[in-house]
Amino acid sequence: MEISNDDLRDKTAAMKQQAFAVKAPLTIVFVFDTNVIPAISGRNPIVMEWVKLYTGFAAQNVYLACASMGLGTCARGSFKHDDLAPVLKLAEGKVVTLCMPVGVPED
């Protein structure tokens, strides 16, 4: 995986009401690789439900880690899918499932 210094935060904020996502210094992007399950690769509805479930498990750990460090986060499923995948240079078969901006809470 190639790490970029490009600022891609605007690609993770789908709506103006989600301006906090653009302000966050870090966004964790969860990606599912459909190629790891060759027999059922693609966007099989049952597989995608399991992917969402396991993404949720991982996201819960991010919530707990952030809370323990005094940081804030929020799981976001609404983002610009069509804009985000190309700028992340995702290979064929990789699907973004969730974005979690992380930062210091304003409150």
Segments (PLM) and residue ranges:
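Acidic, surface-exposed loops and disordered segments
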Residues: M1-D107
